[in-house]
Amino acid sequence: MNAGNDPLFIVDDFEVEELPENMDMIESITVLKDASATAIWGSRAANGVIVITTKKGKANDFKISYSNNFKVSAKPNFDDLHRANSEQIIDYDREAHLYGYNSMMGGFGYEGSGYSLSQEILNDYWEDVIIDWETGAVSPMDPQKLAEMDARLNKLKAYSNRKQIEDYLLRNAFRQQHMISVSGGTDRVNYFLSGSFIGGHSEYVGDQERSYNINSRISYKLLHNLTLRSDLSATFDNNDNGYTNLSNDIYNLFPFQMLVDEAGNRIADYTQFSRMDADKYTQEYGYLSFGKNLLDEIDMANNTTKNTDYKARFGLDYRVIEGLNLSADYQYERYQSINKDIQSINSYGVRELINQHTVIGENGLSYRIPKGDILDHSQTDVEAWTMKIGATLNRNFGADKQHYVNATAGFEARSKHTTTESYRKLGYNDQTLSWSPIDAIDLATNGTTPPWSSNPMRYYASSYDKFSDILNREISYYLSAVYTYDNRYTVSGSLRIDKSNLFGVSDKYRRNPIWSFGANWNIKNEKFFKCDAISALMLRASLGLTGNFDRSGRTSPIMVGQFISSDLVDGGGYMRITTPPNPLLRWERTRSINLSVDLGLFDRINTTLTYYHNKGYDLLGEAQLDPTVGYSEQLINSADMNNSGVEVQLDADLIRTRDFTWNVGWVFGYNENKIIRNSAHDSSPVLNRVHGTTRFVEGYSREGIWSYRWAGLNEMGLPQAYKADGTKVTTYEDLTVEDLEYSGTYQPKYSGSLSTGFRYKNLQANFLFTYNFGHVFRVEYPDMNPFGSSPALNERIADRWRQPGDEAKTDVPAICSDMMNYLMTYQTGASELAQYSSNSIRKGDMIRLREILLNYDLPKKWLRNSPVKRLSITAQLNNVWLWTANKEGYDPEAVSPVSGTFSLTDPIAFTCGVKLDF
């Protein structure tokens, strides 16, 4: 569960972390799910295996091919975030101000804390709202002052930065791919040579991607029974990352915060101070500017990443006798990634850091962080090798060749050595490659107290200087065999033993045996079966055991620590424990049973029905510990889970003539899982369940969502929840796990796709629909914190409770008008009750038109007098249409299902391309 649930990718018989970026390199893709098919691939096969075969050269088939595609995506639609507009946020701040919250705090913010333009206006009037501290009563503002304040606020309401964001910060994402290949061969040599380029940019202004790849695949027939294979590739990436915080900063812009004024001059956003406070420190004392403008940040960004990836693979195939082959393969990979981020002294982040550690002395300002640029440098190096030695027997025997045997045995060893280093240089000069030293110990222990703060600000230089060295080694032994009699009865079996150094020195925990057994019955080939309408009929069954483990380093049988080179007290070194020891760490294991029926009708319809049941045990989960032992939580083997379902796959040629075909493909899946054991202790089960941090609740789905039972708003506009006995409470602190409601699972129970394709002569059209049903998700509620609004406020604040009686027509809580009540009760879980209530749950059912694809092959007669043998033109649309069951039309795939946070949906995208064969 926590060891990962991604499938295993196998490319040309070797395990890889990612799929090839250029799909034109791929010859075929096969998905393996049943136990007999996946057990042979080892520990990560518990989540399924995707086997990819890339293109090779063919004898006497010389070919030059070129392909390209260009993809353009629409700009992001920020309406998907459902943020409040300027008027809604300002009205919200104004109401909180009139209730006295601003006055109670002496202003929405304090010097150096940061506040918005609307709060900056309201801060000018905080003394005009008088609070009776004995009764909590708030006096109304003087009408003249109120009118003056409203006039300033109304002017601000008219501003909206949406168009400026779209014009200056966003663009249509673009990506292009080009590939050229030469392939062919003779009776002794086959070759496939290719080169490709990928370039483009994201939807955010400032970044740029460039990637180059060359590949050589050659096989040499050294002897009549001995073949040498080589596969060499190199990839070079050179990327400009731009201003990497741009998307996050856009999210955090208040809608009335403009980027430029009417004359086109850039406007600074004073996120730390009001303009008045900022001017005081810059003009009177000489501090660096406290303003920030995203256009400036984009212009100053100097953040690059360079990646190189070299792979060399060599293999030998030796045919001992007819049907018996030996093979040996070795792959070596060297990968390096270097990131260099030079942050200008004029960028906001550098100015902020320098200002925080600048003190006013008798002789002016003293800079404890040197004035200059900052260099953040990181480098990752990976050296990996894989060796495989195996034997394969593939024979038919018997008088009528009725017996068929395919057996494979082999050995595999893998090693992956990863080193990383990162460091920061302050006062950096890229021209002279120089930097300035700092008093790191004093900055970390004593820090600096700037004049706008009563607390010291500390700078931990050691947190930027990191080094790591990780070595993973795995060894595997495997054996598999398939026997078929008369093309009717088949039995198969496999055994694999995996060992990993991640489990310490004890062979008891290092070794992971994996096995499978399967049987097939091809009924169609039985002599008694006489039905011409049924073109295929086969029964299949398999069972097996697979395993998985956490490769991320979050758990270990031995203690893992990080050496800190400088102690803050005496300057010496010390060891920080990063992973506590888990001497009982074991592999995650999965027992699988698969039953399938393959049915073909009239040589036009093919369908497969599969039932599977998987039992996972010793699954890794977060266990909360007694803090007195030194750790609050640890990843341990703590849970068992059942996972079962049904899959149906149908392909049908409804119409099939020489010039016209119409085919339909349908995939349907039903899946449900249930935790059947959990030995981990949960010290805060109520909050952890509703927040989704507790996944192992016995008797329920791993992806279950828990909620407070919604009881509506009370007469003061406060959210309420039901206890199990029906009583109402206004704070989660009065609730236990028995009071919670199980809302369902965010993992779809029913999912699949429907595809249909038409071909008329050389023109093809395909449509792909995907669907998900039987799941739920949570939607975002406004955070009703009256002490200053956030740019991420949900637009539903406009529907909040405002007066008695509103509780009958809205479910959005009020800004509590009684400060005393707020301080005593409302702030303790008021927004929590609403956000994580059953009222925030929506159905996740959806149908999406994922893809429309058109392809046209030029008739060969048009190319008869040209060197081009084939020319194909493709056009494709993605993310075309969406239907959802929830009434608001929220895209379930663009919402965090547990927290309800909205994200941007995938925009519609258009792709076109050309393929040519010479």
Feature map (PLM): residue ranges:
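A subset of solvent-exposed loop/turn segments in beta-rich extracellular surface proteins, enriched
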Residues: 80, 87-102, 275-297, 345-369
